[in-house]
Each structure stands twice: as structure tokens, then as C-alpha cells.
């Protein structure tokens, strides 16, 4: 089991005590942070090595809330369909934080740190400026005094993994990250009729609002996430589970061309076999079946 060292500098605690009204009340709160992943079709495994988590208070210097010893190497492809893995569960000074930084070990030419496995071959996976900046989420969070802040970071690998044209064989990770409050998210799940599926690697793209589905190309509408369509061995049905959705309407569209969807270009060959609108509700799983 990985060991987590909590390291809170006195200066950060003092500054946040003042922000919370001094020492007359409860000046700490708990923060829980997990990671999950949206589907990607072309890889057998995507390993990211995390070495710690850093927080930046609104007032005061950043500090490492967790230092992993040894580092934690997590296969993000195992974290789909609502599955997540906890990174930290720690007590910190209550207050507002400007950003969260995930410290990662990901270097060019070194597949023993972070890596991607494709067709059985393992390739280095590196993050530009990863050693200096890590993976930073700048949306900001609030840890309530005497309360619990419970978040999940969603890695969308379909948008994040790129193969540069430098001949090295190293893959680059430019993460598309979503920081989600677990108390505010729900899921949409259901079946996809076998008659709609034209291949073995199909996914359901999820778009915010009522829109016409499009491929991943960096222009709106881009999916906020996607979910793999997998065969349920018990029922024989093809199922998907799109999790960690903020409450509101979404367009869901299955495609069996996701493996060829290049996030850097507009792929006219990505065909959606159906499209339906569903409304996600916090803390609920909404059912939506594609019947053909």
C-alpha cells in the first residue's frame, strides 16, 4: 500500500486561520481527491505515475498536501464507467484554494515512469513541462471549515494523448482535465442495440446540451466525455455508463469510429449511428437505451 505523507507548512495554516475568522472556530476541513478516465480505444494501458498533490491557498504559498512514497503508478484505462481511484483524503486548513497540482513523473524516453501500451508495445508517455508544472487544475476549490470537499479529476484520454511527428515513438500527454464536485454529478447509462454496432470498439460520445454530434477536433461541439460500449457477459447486451456528469441536458451519440478519431483534425469519417438527449441528475443514474 502506498504511504501518504501530509505536510502542511505553519505559514499556510496561519494565513487560512485568519481568512476563516481566527482560531475561534473549526479552522480545518477534509479534502478527498480521486481520478477517473473517459474511454479511449487505441491503447491497451495508459500508465501515469503520480508523486504527490500540491494545493495553492488563495492567500499564502502553495504546499504539498501529499507526498507519495513510493510514487503511485496508475493505469487510467482501468478507471472507466464510473470507476475512480482515490489519490488523497487529507485534513487541510479550511478556505479557498486557487489551484490543485498533480505532481507526475513523465519524461521522454523513459517508459518506466509514465507510459502507453499499444498492440502489446510499451512507449514512453511524457508531459510537456511536466517536471516543472505537473498537471495543474486552476478552477479553484473551497474546503469548508469542519466539512468535507469531495472531488474527482476526469482525464479524457481521447483528447489528451498525441503522437508527435518526431520519429521518437514517444507519446505526449496534453491532459484535458475536468475537476468535478462529487456531490453535483450523476450518470447516464443504458444499452446499445447490437444492430447499431458496426465494430468491436464502439463508444458513446457525450455532448453538453442538445447539439448535433461531431468528432473530437478542438472546436465546438466537442464531447465533454465518452463511455466505452462493452458486452455484458451475463445479459449478452452491449452497455455503456457515462459517469461524472454535471446536472443538465446532454446529447449522447454512439460511434464505432472512435479509435480513428484524431483530436488534432476534423475527421469526416467519424459516423454516429444514433443520437438522443438525456438530462443528467446529481447523485442519480439516468437510463437511456439506443434501440436501433
Can you name each region flagged by the protein language model?
Residues 1-11:
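Bacterial N-terminal signal peptides that target proteins for export
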Residues 16-19:
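C-terminal motif of bacterial Sec signal peptides marking the signal peptidase cleavage site
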Residues 21-292:
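A short, solvent-exposed, low-complexity linear motif enriched for acidic/polar residues
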Amino acid at each position: 500500500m502506498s504511504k501518504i505523507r501530509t505536510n502542511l507548512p505553519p505559514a499556510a495554516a496561519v494565513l487560512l486561520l485568519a481568512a476563516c475568522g481566527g482560531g475561534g472556530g473549526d479552522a480545518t476541513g477534509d479534502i478527498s481527491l480521486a481520478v477517473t478516465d473517459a474511454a479511449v480505444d487505441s491503447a491497451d494501458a495508459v500508465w501515469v505515475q503520480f508523486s504527490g498533490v500540491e494545493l495553492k491557498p488563495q492567500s499564502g504559498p502553495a504546499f504539498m498536501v501529499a507526498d507519495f512514497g513510493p510514487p503511485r503508478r496508475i493505469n487510467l484505462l482501468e478507471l472507466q464507467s464510473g470507476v475512480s481511484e482515490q489519490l488523497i483524503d487529507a485534513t487541510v486548513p479550511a478556505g479557498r484554494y486557487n489551484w490543485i497540482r498533480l505532481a507526475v513523473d513523465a519524461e521522454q524516453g523513459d517508459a518506466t515512469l509514465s507510459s502507453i501500451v499499444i498492440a502489446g508495445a510499451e512507449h514512453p508517455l511524457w508531459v510537456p513541462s511536466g517536471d516543472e508544472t505537473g498537471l495543474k487544475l486552476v478552477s479553484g476549490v473551497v474546503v469548508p471549515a469542519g466539512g468535507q470537499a469531495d472531488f474527482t479529476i476526469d482525464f479524457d484520454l481521447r483528447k489528451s494523448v498525441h503522437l508527435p511527428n518526431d520519429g521518437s515513438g514517444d507519446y505526449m500527454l496534453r491532459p484535458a482535465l475536468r475537476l468535478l464536485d462529487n456531490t453535483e454529478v450523476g450518470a447516464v447509462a443504458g444499452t446499445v442495440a447490437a444492430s447499431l454496432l458496426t465494430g468491436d470498439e464502439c463508444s458513446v460520445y457525450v455532448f453538453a446540451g442538445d447539439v448535433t454530434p461531431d468528432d473530437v477536433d478542438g472546436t465546438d461541439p466537442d464531447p465533454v466525455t465518452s463511455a466505452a460500449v462493452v458486452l455484458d457477459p451475463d445479459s449478452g447486451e452491449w452497455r455503456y455508463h457515462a459517469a461524472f456528469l454535471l446536472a443538465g441536458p446532454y446529447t449522447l451519440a454512439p460511434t464505432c469510429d472512435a479509435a480513428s478519431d484524431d483530436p488534432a483534425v476534423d475527421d469526416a469519417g467519424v459516423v454516429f449511428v444514433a443520437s438522443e438527449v438525456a438530462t443528467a441528475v446529481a447523485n442519480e443514474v439516468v437510463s437511456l437505451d439506443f434501440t436501433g
